Amino acid sequence: MSYGPLDMYRNPGPSGPQLRDFSSIIQTCSGNIQRISQATAQIKNLMSQLGTKQDSSKLQENLQQLQHSTNQLAKETNELLKELGSLPLPLSTSEQRQQRLQKERLMNDFSAALNNFQAVQRRVSEKEKESIARARAGSRLSAEERQREEQLVSFDSHEEWNQMQSQEDEVAITEQDLELIKERETAIRQLEADILDVNQIFKDLAMMIHDQGDLIDSIEANVESSEVHVERATEQLQRAAYYQKKSRKKMCILVLVLSVIILILGLIIWLVYKTK
């Protein structure tokens, strides 16, 4: 399995600002969160090799690049969530509630992925520091320098000269080790800066969740208001139906009375003509 920098953790696309709708941002964020989780699992695997026989400068480089690219992916997702919050709400109350539920689920998933990622980041930092401490403790540079200072300028035998040359070779190797230590310290500083970036993302996420809560209250208030209007409209419809039914009943009675009157008048007229 290759643990080099992964292109899958980047989102290729045309440069320049683009207008994105709610669904496309949701889809991109969901994909990013999945990639963050996958990268976290790979970082754990690489981390388990630190301090073992598999530990090497190549492993360190791959680990650093992978965690840094994952950190950038988290920052990109954070910006997308901010963009998501700035989109205008749909007119339909049901669509507002649906979008609210989608954003709520997305932020929960993002928060969980960030928690796992940051926990691994902190553990990597601890293991790197432990590795550096062991390397410094095993360094022979200071001891070799003291031996060189105490060494006489002249040598009594060829054996002493060879011993001095051997010591200088060991010092050169130790200096190379120290250069690797410096590189690891630089990587740790970058890792700690990335951890601070994740802390800032958590703060932004907390603010978005707070704003989401205000939005939920607003939507619920609109829903309650709509329900009140619906209830009132229902009452008015029921009242109108009652009056309409009552009016129809009156019309039927009136028609019946008129029919009786016409019938009576018809009988009277018929009787009058009959008597003549």
From Swiss-Prot:
**Which Pfam families has this protein been placed in?**
SNARE, Syntaxin_2
Where are its TM segments located?
Answer: 249-269
Residues in the Vesicular compartment per record? 270-276
Query: Which residue spans adopt a coiled-coil conformation according to this UniProt entry?
Result: 33-131
Q: Which residues carry this modification: N-acetylserine?
A: 2
Question: How does it sit in the bilayer?
Answer: Single-pass type IV membrane protein
Q: Which SMART domains match?
A: SynN, t_SNARE
Post-translational modification Phosphoserine, affected residues:
139, 142, 218, 225
Where in the chain are disulfide-linked cysteines found? Answer: none
Result of mutating residue 88 to R?
In a breast cancer sample; somatic mutation
PROSITE patterns given in the database record: SYNTAXIN, T_SNARE
Q: What GO MF annotations does this protein's record show?
A: SNAP receptor activity; SNARE binding
Q: Where found?
A: Endosome membrane; Golgi apparatus membrane; Endomembrane system; Early endosome membrane
Mapped to this chain, the residue ranges on the Cytoplasmic side of the membrane are 2-248
Assembly, per entry: Interacts with NAPA and SNAP23. Identified in a complex containing STX6, STX12, VAMP4 and VTI1A. Associates with the BLOC-1 complex. Interacts with BLOC1S6. Interacts with GRIPAP1. Forms a complex with GRIP1, GRIA2 and NSG1; controls the intracellular fate of AMPAR and the endosomal sorting of the GRIA2 subunit toward recycling and membrane targeting. Interacts with NSG1. Interacts with TPC1. Interacts (via N-terminus) with VPS13B.
Against PANTHER family, the record matches this protein to: SYNTAXIN, SYNTAXIN-12
The similarity comment for this entry is:
Belongs to the syntaxin family.
Q: What does this protein do?
A: SNARE promoting fusion of transport vesicles with target membranes. Together with SNARE STX6, promotes movement of vesicles from endosomes to the cell membrane, and may therefore function in the endocytic recycling pathway. Through complex formation with GRIP1, GRIA2 and NSG1 controls the intracellular fate of AMPAR and the endosomal sorting of the GRIA2 subunit toward recycling and membrane targeting.
Q: What name does the UniProt record give this protein?
A: Syntaxin-12
Please name the source species: Homo sapiens (Human)
The record lists the lineage as: Eukaryota, Metazoa, Chordata, Craniata, Vertebrata
